[in-house]
């Protein structure tokens, strides 16, 4: 039978759904785990039985989908990914091929060139799109993927150098607009979480750094 696992945060309408494109043979809740969870925490496991003829192979795809709004939205995303993941993967490959062509370099040191290409890819992984704020560059994976005023003053210079002026300008715009909402006095925020909560309204350096960052992006 199918086993679609659903989980919801007790205090918020945050939902996650996960499963696979094959029937599960065994599933169990509250299984032992090596991961230390905060609060009450929940765990689940599923077992899949696969029979392979000699010299054959089989692909098993797992899907994780979530929503900050409802279980229905999470389930819709889950079904969409399950049905179209092959096409989505090809689209993603094409996207990253185009990304590597942006700000492309060709140097004798191919190892350094590979590092440069991975820097562009890693930077793209930090791009976030918040409905309530806009698109911006996060600070760093995995601990601090949200918005920082100080960090971006430095990061955006590298972003422009690798050819992504659009994301650099979008990030500056989000910092400016969210700082205005939080401070209303020209002070630039230090940190904003993904729920648009400004947890730190800014130190002395963020405002000066922001002015310099604007100059470096638009000069």
Q: What are these regions, as identified by a protein language model?
A:
Residues 1-145:
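Acidic/polar, glycine-enriched structural segments that form the non-catalytic walls/loops
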Residues 50-52, 58, 145-219:
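Aromatic-rich carbohydrate-recognition surfaces in CAZymes
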């Amino acid at each position: 039978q199918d086993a679609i696992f659903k989980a919801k945060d007790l205090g918020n309408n945050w939902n996650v759904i996960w499963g696979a494109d094959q029937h599960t043979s065994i599933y169990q809740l509250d299984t032992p785990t090596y991961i230390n969870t905060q609060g009450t925490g929940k765990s689940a496991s599923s077992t899949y039985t696969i029979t392979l003829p000699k010299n054959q192979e089989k692909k098993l795809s797992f899907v994780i989908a979530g929503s900050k709004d409802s279980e229905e939205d999470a389930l819709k995303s889950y079904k969409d990914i399950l049905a179209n993941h092959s096409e989505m993967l090809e689209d993603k490959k094409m996207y990253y091929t185009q990304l590597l062509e942006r700000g492309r370099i060709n140097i004798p040191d191919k190892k350094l060139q590979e590092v440069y290409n991975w820097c562009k890819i890693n930077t793209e992984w930090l791009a976030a799109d918040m409905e309530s704020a806009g698109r911006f560059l996060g600070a760093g994976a995995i601990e601090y993927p949200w918005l920082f005023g100080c960090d971006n003053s430095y990061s955006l210079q590298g972003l422009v150098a690798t050819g992504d002026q659009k994301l650099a300008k979008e990030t500056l715009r989000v910092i400016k607009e969210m700082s205005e909402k939080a401070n209303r006095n020209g002070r630039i925020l230090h940190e904003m979480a993904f729920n648009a909560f400004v947890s730190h309204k800014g130190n002395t350096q963020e405002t000066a750094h922001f002015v310099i960052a604007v100059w470096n992006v638009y000069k």
